[in-house]
UniProtKB/Swiss-Prot annotation:
Function according to Swiss-Prot or TrEMBL: Pyrophosphatase that catalyzes the hydrolysis of nucleoside triphosphates to their monophosphate derivatives, with a high preference for the non-canonical purine nucleotides XTP (xanthosine triphosphate), dITP (deoxyinosine triphosphate) and ITP. Seems to function as a house-cleaning enzyme that removes non-canonical purine nucleotides from the nucleotide pool, thus preventing their incorporation into DNA/RNA and avoiding chromosomal lesions.
Active site: 72
Lineage of producing organism: Bacteria, Bacillati, Actinomycetota, Actinomycetes, Mycobacteriales
Enzyme category, top tier: hydrolase
Positions contributing to substrate binding: 7-12, 73, 163-166, 195, 200-201
Biological process terms in GO annotation: nucleotide metabolic process; purine nucleoside triphosphate catabolic process
Subunit and partners: Homodimer.
Protein name as catalogued: dITP/XTP pyrophosphatase
Keyword Magnesium set for record: yes
Length: 217
């Protein structure tokens, strides 16, 4: 079955495909927004991560008639009262300018002592099914899942992997058996597979994969 992933980020599609393969789920063809000839941009006007994900899945089902997955993820910094939060991608004013966002966060955290640099990533994922598909499969029309990844904000970027705030985030939780080897590393220094094992998105997507298995042809 074709399933729309309401994102133009190819890394997100690759991430979900890895999760499906790891769970031996076949028969799901993921389609990204970049694969569609025309698709209007969806404004992210929600007050929470799950609100934004739901806005995108509603649009996806309405425009394509396909089961649609969307996520909204971000970084919540304790010393900033949970911000950037839902504004993570556009914290510096533009949208998706990782360097500007990271530079601004570093400036805002410049005087914050180590013991107050706690933060966590949040990923809210929503799967919405067209009513007919849900009825045929005996499923709900909407599923929402969430994953969190706790750590702290570093004082300088480390690593060039991942995306977003990854180079500034030192996770508390690391892949089992690799804690000593990876101690002090940023999320931007982990491999994709290492991130999948422990990250907020990895946790949310594993829950989603269990649901997607019911759609496999």
């Amino acid at each position: 079955m074709r399933v729309l992933v309401a994102s133009r980020n190819k890394k997100k599609l690759a991430e979900l495909n890895r999760m499906l393969e790891a769970a031996n789920v076949t028969g799901i063809e993921l389609v990204g927004l970049g694969d569609l000839p025309e698709y209007p941009e969806t404004p992210e006007t929600g007050a929470t991560f799950v609100d934004n994900a739901r806005i995108k899945t509603n649009d996806g089902v309405r425009h394509t008639g396909l089961p649609t997955i969307a996520d909204d993820s971000g970084l919540a910094v304790d010393a900033l009262n949970g911000m950037p939060g839902v504004l993570s991608a556009r914290w510096s004013g533009g949208h998706g300018d990782d360097k500007a966002n990271n530079d601004l966060l570093l400036a805002q955290m410049g005087d914050v002592p180590d013991e107050r640099r706690g933060a966590h990533f949040v990923s809210s994922c929503v799967l919405q099914l067209p009513a007919q598909v849900a009825a045929e499969r005996g499923m709900e029309t909407e599923y929402a899942v969430e994953g969190r990844w706790y750590g702290r904000v570093l004082r300088a970027e480390q690593g060039e992997g991942g995306f977003g705030y990854d180079p500034l985030f030192a996770p508390d939780e690391l892949p089992e058996g690799q804690e000593e080897q990876l101690a002090g590393k940023s999320a931007g220094e982990l491999t994709a597979e290492q991130k999948d094992a422990v990250s907020h998105r990895g946790k949310a997507l594993r829950q989603l994969v269990e649901i997607l298995a019911q759609l496999a042809d």
